[in-house]
Amino acid sequence: MVLQKLPLMSIGLLWLLIIVGPLVNADGPVCPPKPSDKLSRAHFPKGFLFGTATAAYQVEGAVNETCRGPSVWDIYCKKYPEKCNGDNGTQAVDFFYRYKEDIQLMKNLNTDSFRLSISWTRIFPHGREENGVSKSGVQFYHDLIDELKRNGIIPFVTVFHWDTPQTLENEYGGFLSAHIVKDFREYAEFVFKEYGGKVKHWITFNEPWVFAHAGYDVGKKAPGRCSPYAKDETVKGDCLGGRSGYEAYLVSHNLLNAHAEAVEAFRQCEKCKGGKIGIAHSPAWFEPHDFKDEQSGATIDRALDFIMGWHLDTTMFGDYPQTMKDIVGHRLPKFTTEQIAKLKNSADFVGINYYTSTFSKHLEKPNHAEPKFKQDSLVEWKNKNVNNITIGSKPETGPLPVYSTGFRKVLKYVKDKYANPEIIIMENGYGENLKENDSVENGTADYNRESYLKKHLWSMHKAICEDKVNVTGYFVWSLMDNFEWQDGFKNRFGLYYIDYKNNLTRHEKVSGKYYREFLSEGVRPSAIKKDEL
């Protein structure tokens, strides 16, 4: 056999590739990892942020401290306990008092960022500045943000995570009224000016389609509004007023205009210069119910237009997707020319909360006499496909199917449709209800959650490496178990187990240990300079 002679440099490079593995740009991801590699932070781009997420009402508690006023969730869960599993956020998991301890839990995980939300009524107890400002409430978030930064953890702040001031709900119906736009801008502008010098990553609204649909179309979350024919089958008790097929669109319209006004205020804020702002969207992925059915395949784009394009198209392009205009018609409010101009390009990044996927089937015969949001998309959400197969896997304790392929597909979809924007994964996590088996021992042995995180981190890495998606950060939902809205405390998402029977003691779970070890390899971003502390 005759061997072709190679230059010494080529031979050296060949041996380097054999010994070291794939070459990588110093700032880029390792693409692909060696087959023997255990995925870790080291395989992601330099400066990629990893963190955990929470929300004020779900973790803070201390509802009577700092002169905090009531939110819709305070009143909803106390007045209708059956709609919140008999639980409420009065104490939640005591984060208000234990945040310093909990920040040490974040450090233990090797995370470098933390997503929190500000309670509107801890700043303005009755919704507006003219009704009073809680100085101690304002100081609480200063103290929290300062403590995070002292510990090298970058704060990401959500301005609104579903806790509308009850005063504004009573006065004009909250987000059902256009009055909310002015009041939200005032509140957002206040927190930007107060914290904008310390916080450079902002989210105006969390999961707007869920907020509108669950709260105003199927009655599943506060304020529990729906038409009786549209009420979600899991909801206990009656709809608390409402008009399905109409109110969700009105609420979202006001929310989007409030977002645009808040972004304008943010971009005019001197302290906020160099910061970024966006929305945390919450898409599922859809696979065709029947791959042989052309109509079934066409449902995917339509479903995504309704649950993501509804708010993402609008903040990118200035208006609703054409599919929504065509189908919803007069029930979909119209933007003015001025509103369109403010909405267009009103996000610096795309926040994505991803949990699960489902099958989509074309809805042949919608009932026009009983309009409702999901029906409007002409899509049926199906748990199993035409062959009676569940999407992904469905662990016994998990209420949602696990399908990490859907995560990657969502990311590629956003890249392709919206010209490769910066994407930050604001939430990704696994919930489980242990029921009668709930204990510290069983709750911390969360191997299903560990598996979920492994699969989704791999899918995200493939999206970055192979699909060239511009993902820059990832937050696990959640740091610890917390109050999960209509599920109360029964649905656990945390990397730390909260012992509700024993002084809310925190216990690291198997998934927490996995995330800690995943983040222990590679360099943490040094994004906080000493002069910023």
Swiss-Prot record:
<dbReference type="GO" id="GO:0008422">
    <property type="term" value="F:beta-glucosidase activity"/>
</dbReference>
<keyword id="KW-0732">Signal</keyword>
<dbReference type="InterPro" id="IPR033132">
    <property type="entry name" value="Glyco_hydro_1_N_CS"/>
</dbReference>
<feature type="disulfide bond">
    <location>
        <begin position="226"/>
        <end position="239"/>
    </location>
</feature>
<feature type="binding site">
    <location>
        <position position="477"/>
    </location>
    <ligand>
        <name>a beta-D-glucoside</name>
    </ligand>
</feature>
<keyword id="KW-1015">Disulfide bond</keyword>
<feature type="active site" description="Nucleophile">
    <location>
        <position position="427"/>
    </location>
</feature>
<dbReference type="GO" id="GO:0005788">
    <property type="term" value="C:endoplasmic reticulum lumen"/>
</dbReference>
<dbReference type="Pfam" id="PF00232">
    <property type="entry name" value="Glyco_hydro_1"/>
</dbReference>
<keyword id="KW-0326">Glycosidase</keyword>
<comment type="similarity">
    <text>Belongs to the glycosyl hydrolase 1 family.</text>
</comment>
<feature type="binding site">
    <location>
        <position position="355"/>
    </location>
    <ligand>
        <name>a beta-D-glucoside</name>
    </ligand>
</feature>
<feature type="glycosylation site" description="N-linked (GlcNAc...) asparagine">
    <location>
        <position position="388"/>
    </location>
</feature>
<feature type="binding site">
    <location>
        <position position="161"/>
    </location>
    <ligand>
        <name>a beta-D-glucoside</name>
    </ligand>
</feature>
<keyword id="KW-0325">Glycoprotein</keyword>
<feature type="glycosylation site" description="N-linked (GlcNAc...) asparagine">
    <location>
        <position position="64"/>
    </location>
</feature>
<dbReference type="GO" id="GO:0005975">
    <property type="term" value="P:carbohydrate metabolic process"/>
</dbReference>
<protein>
    <recommendedName>
        <fullName>Beta-glucosidase 24</fullName>
        <ecNumber>3.2.1.21</ecNumber>
    </recommendedName>
</protein>
<feature type="binding site">
    <location>
        <position position="58"/>
    </location>
    <ligand>
        <name>a beta-D-glucoside</name>
    </ligand>
</feature>
<feature type="glycosylation site" description="N-linked (GlcNAc...) asparagine">
    <location>
        <position position="442"/>
    </location>
</feature>
<feature type="active site" description="Proton donor">
    <location>
        <position position="207"/>
    </location>
</feature>
<feature type="glycosylation site" description="N-linked (GlcNAc...) asparagine">
    <location>
        <position position="503"/>
    </location>
</feature>
<feature type="binding site">
    <location>
        <begin position="206"/>
        <end position="207"/>
    </location>
    <ligand>
        <name>a beta-D-glucoside</name>
    </ligand>
</feature>
<keyword id="KW-0256">Endoplasmic reticulum</keyword>
<feature type="glycosylation site" description="N-linked (GlcNAc...) asparagine">
    <location>
        <position position="437"/>
    </location>
</feature>
<dbReference type="InterPro" id="IPR001360">
    <property type="entry name" value="Glyco_hydro_1"/>
</dbReference>
<feature type="binding site">
    <location>
        <position position="427"/>
    </location>
    <ligand>
        <name>a beta-D-glucoside</name>
    </ligand>
</feature>
<feature type="binding site">
    <location>
        <position position="493"/>
    </location>
    <ligand>
        <name>a beta-D-glucoside</name>
    </ligand>
</feature>
<dbReference type="InterPro" id="IPR017853">
    <property type="entry name" value="Glycoside_hydrolase_SF"/>
</dbReference>
<dbReference type="GO" id="GO:0009536">
    <property type="term" value="C:plastid"/>
</dbReference>
<feature type="binding site">
    <location>
        <begin position="484"/>
        <end position="485"/>
    </location>
    <ligand>
        <name>a beta-D-glucoside</name>
    </ligand>
</feature>
<feature type="short sequence motif" description="Prevents secretion from ER">
    <location>
        <begin position="530"/>
        <end position="533"/>
    </location>
</feature>
<feature type="glycosylation site" description="N-linked (GlcNAc...) asparagine">
    <location>
        <position position="88"/>
    </location>
</feature>
<keyword id="KW-0378">Hydrolase</keyword>
<feature type="glycosylation site" description="N-linked (GlcNAc...) asparagine">
    <location>
        <position position="470"/>
    </location>
</feature>
<feature type="signal peptide">
    <location>
        <begin position="1"/>
        <end position="26"/>
    </location>
</feature>
